[in-house]
Every structure is written in C-alpha cells, then in structure tokens.
Regions:
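Conserved catalytic/switch belt of AAA+ P-loop NTPases
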Residues: 136-150
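Clamp-loader machinery-focused feature within the broader ASCE/P-loop NTPase space
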Residues: 1-133
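Active-site-adjacent scaffolding segments
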Residues: 75-78, 116, 152, 166-172
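Charged, glycine-rich active-site and insertion segments that engage polyanionic ligands
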Residues: 1-48, 69, 111, 147-149, ...
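Loop/turn-to-beta-strand initiation segments
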Residues: 117-121, 146-152
Length: 437
C-alpha cells in the first residue's frame, strides 16, 4: 500500500488496501497487542477512504485536501472516540443531551449528512474499553449503519467486546513488528539517532507505538530505566524492603504512564507529518478530540473488586505488614493505579525474561540494553526454577488485574514472588541490611 504510515504489518496493509480499492465493510475490527499500530492503520484506512485522488490505486495520495485534513486531525467526516473520564472508559452518554466523546453523541453526529458529501469514517480507539451500555448502543448502528459510513474498532482484546458486536465486524489482525523494522522507522522519522533507535526498538518488544512514544520523551526513557534498576536491586532485598520498594516503583510507573501519554499525540503526529507533509486548513471537527496514539500501553480497568482470586488471596497474609503510605502524597485514581500496576508488571516481566536469556547465554537477545552487565552478573546467582515460577506468576497476576483484583495486593504478591539471589537467600534473618547481598 503506497504512502502508508503503518510499518511492519504487510498482511494487514494488504487487507486495508483492498478495502480502499473495492468496497470497504461498514464495520471492521483491528485486533492486536497494544502499541502495534492499530490506530495508525485505522488512520491509513481513513486517509484512503477520504482521499480526493480520482485514481483509487493512488489513495491515500497524501497531497490532497482530504489527506491533509486527516493527517492534521481536522477532517469533518472523520469521527473519533477514545476512553476518557473516571475508569478510563468509552461511555454511552446522556439520553437527552449526550456529551461529546460518547457513543450517543457519535450517533447524533452520524444522523447528519456528510460535510464533504462523500464517505465518512469512525475510529473507536481502545474499543475494548467500551462499557456494555456503550457497546449495546453502538450495536444498533452496526446493525443499521448509515450510508457511506465505515466504523473501525481498534481493540487490544476482542474478548472484551460483546459477541454481538464482534459478529458484525470484519477482522484485520496485527502482530508484533520486527525490531529492525521499528529501528528503521524511527530513523526515517528522524526522532532518534541510530544507537537510540536500536535501543528503543529492543525495549518496545515489537510495539512501534511504544518505541515512538519513548523516542519523543527522554523523561519517560529515564523513568523506565530507574524502574528497571529498582527491580534488579530487589533481587538482593529482604521481604520488608521489597514491600517498601514496590510502593515506590508503582509511583514511578504512574509517572512513566503520564510521560508516555503526554507524548503519544506528538509521536503519531510526527508519523503522519512524515507521510503527508504540512497540514492544510483548520476546518471541521472530530467527535472527540481523542489523544492520537499508535496504540495503548496498558488497558486499565475500573475500580478494584474486594475479593481477590486465589493466587493473590493466598499471599495476602505474607503481604500484610506493608509500611503505611505517606498521607501527604495524593492517592492516584483507581484507573491510574491499575494502569501503573500493568506498566510495572510489563517491565518486571521483561527483566525476568532477560535474566532467563542471560542464563542461557543469549546476550544479543537482551532487551534491557542499559542493564546488560548487571543482568549478566546477577543471572548465575538466581535459581532458574524460581525464575520460571515467577514468570508464570506474572501471567496469573496480569489476568487477575483484568478481573479487578486490587493492584496493590497483586504487586505485593509479585514482590514476594520475585527470586532472591543466593547470597540474599542465605543471609541470616537478623543480618544488617547492608550485609544482605
């Protein structure tokens, strides 16, 4: 597909190209891991459908008024929804006067005629964050779509959507992107030099959107590095120190989320500008001034349930004596705490994976490039069996976070499950902290 911003998804791009050349379905779902380019691909499709070039094979041309309006986020017939507000959800909206950014407001917008008189495109970012009421309202539009409207749902996990919604959508699947492809892409955009592009491509783990966000925020990269080092340091810590450390790491993960979110818009804007050049015109509006992202890092869910699944519940007694949090520090909203927990969990799993790779002698495959020496040094002192058990526990706790288990309890369990180096494990219980290595 010519002039596509999306990289590393040849099969998905071929399917989108066929939609532009032929007749686009009234509803299509882009499914794949977060930050693999679903929103970027949706914008490529929107640019193609709203392009004014008379030759379908040349769309998107990236030169016409329509293409520039899509790139600048100002095309009047491109409508976007994204999670917002408490719980970070997409909501149905009030029945009488629905607020912008809700499904009912979108339905009202689509009841009007198109501004440009041609196709209209709806992009629902993080569609898995729609609550059931919003999905049922959207379902009516999927069953009886307005003429000329293509609805694109971007979802990390389609199982979060109602079966009736899924059944009315064509599927396009996206997977992780190769590290070399991400590295070249960052270089082409001019957002990072060659060494940094290579480092970020490894850190991203196949997610170009995440690499792009880090490229635009050295602060986010710095915070992530501090979190990674803190996790490695915990290998030598005792129980009480771990429970204190995980609280600080969670705060850092929340700061990382903020830094990444602040730059995702700039990241996708840079990618679009590289393909489309300077944007023209400021007319038109979107259904929601959604934050443009190449994919979400995490999928936070609403406030935690009181009952914890067995894995977390069984360790609750061990995790009980946690130091009280500083009352002067504002408590994060439930959705932000859950997002921070997911972010920390992801970095923790990456560190565990790298230690396992280092134990197998696979240095070139390590993702944490800045910690190569530390990881190689600590790998022989960590039990491979305990590491395998820990990585399995990460998967269990990740699922529990999706099921509304309390993030603080889940992270306490993980901290106590994190392997200890042999020296730390063999240290006397009453040994001074400075002598426990």
């Amino acid at each position: 597909m010519k002039n596509a911003v999306t990289r590393g998804q040849p099969r998905a791009l071929a399917e989108v190209e066929s939609m532009i050349l032929g007749r686009a379905p009234h509803a299509v779902m882009f499914v794949g891991p977060g930050s693999t380019g679903k929103t970027t691909l949706a914008l490529d499709l929107a640019a193609g459908l709203l392009c004014g070039d008379p030759d379908p094979g040349a769309r998107p041309c990236r030169e016409c008024r329509g293409c520039h309006q899509v790139a600048s986020g100002n095309h009047p017939d491109l409508h976007r929804l994204a999670p917002d507000g408490p719980g970070d959800q997409i909501r149905i909206g009030k029945a009488g006067d629905p607020e912008p950014g809700t499904v009912r407001h979108l339905i009202n917008e689509l009841a009007l005629l198109p501004v440009e008189g041609g196709a209209r495109v709806v992009i629902v970012e993080q569609a898995h964050r729609m609550n059931d009421d919003a999905q049922n309202a959207l379902l009516k539009m999927l069953e009886e779509p307005p003429a000329g409207v293509t609805i694109v749902l971007c979802a990390d996990d389609e199982e979060c959507l109602l079966p009736t919604v899924r059944s009315r959508c064509a599927r396009v699947r996206l997977g992780p992107v190769g590290g070399r492809e991400i590295e070249r892409w960052l270089g082409d955009l001019g957002v990072a030099d060659a060494p940094r592009s290579a480092r970020l491509a490894r850190l991203a783990g196949g997610r170009p959107g995440l690499a792009l966000a880090y490229a635009h925020s050295s602060e986010a990269e710095r915070i992530r590095g501090e979190i990674a080092r803190g996790i490695v340091d915990m290998l030598a810590q005792g129980r009480a120190a771990r429970l204190a450390s995980v609280r600080e790491l969670t705060k850092s993960a929340a700061a990382l989320d903020t830094a990444l979110d602040s730059w995702r818009s700039a990241g996708l804007a840079a990618a679009a500008a590289a393909a489309a050049g300077p944007a023209r015109g400021r007319n038109g509006k979107a259904t929601k001034a959604a934050t443009a992202s190449a994919g979400a890092l995490t999928a936070p869910v609403p406030a935690a349930a009181e009952d914890a699944p067995p894995v977390a519940a069984n360790a609750a007694q061990d995790a009980a004596p946690v130091a009280a949090e500083d009352a002067s520090v504002p408590r994060l909203a439930a959705a932000d705490r859950r997002s921070a927990a997911s972010t920390l969990l992801e970095i923790w799993a990456s560190i565990g994976r790298d230690i396992s790779v280092a134990q197998a002698g696979g240095g070139p495959q390590l993702r944490e490039v800045e910690l190569v020496d530390e990881l190689r040094a600590v790998a022989p002192a960590v039990s491979p069996a305990s590491l395998v058990s820990f990585l399995a526990r990460v998967g269990e706790i990740s699922n529990q976070l999706d099921e509304n288990v309390g993030p603080e309890l889940a992270l306490d369990v993980l901290a106590l499950s994190w392997p200890r180096t042999e020296a730390a494990a063999n240290a006397p219980a009453n040994a001074p902290a400075g002598h426990r290595r």
